[in-house]
Amino acid sequence: MTVSLKKGQKVDLTKGNSGISKVIVGLGWDEKKSGKGGLFGAMFGKKGADIDCDASAIMCTNGKCISAEDVVYFGNLRHKSGAVTHMGDNLTGAGEGDDEQIVVDLTRVPQQYDRIVIVVNIYQAVARHQDFGMIQNAFIRIVDCRNNTEMCKFNLSENYDGMYAMVFGELYRHDGEWKFNAIGQGTQDPGL
């Protein structure tokens, strides 16, 4: 049964789920169709560049990323520990369901990492004059790999105008158990 989360809510992933080891972090978004390209763009077939959202998993120690190697994204698809794997880049966000997926083997996450922050940024957001105000239906969900069951889902529904990147949520270790925190925090940092 899926737990529908609101911003700031947390859910335990491993307590009471004996045997869970791998989860899929599924992320999705759609580009808003209105206003893109303007009147002349509609008349003459010209439009701005597609919005390319990119998901990343940042492995943190005491809440901080220690090394660039600890960022798993389209340019570094697998963490050196083998615990986190990015399943590839979706350049348009088109289609139903997850646009990008990150697989996390909770049992292989080295002890020095206490959280895995899941962020999504817009590729070349500043140069393309794009922000998360142009995105709709954004979500993050956690799926149990054993049976492909959705454990929890967080729909990001706030207005994120002017934000170039978003912290969707985080997996974190607390007292030996893994939990998920629905964050939904935007930032104007285009380099995140």
Language-model regions, residue ranges each:
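Intrinsic-disorder/low-complexity signal
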Residues: 1-115, 119-192
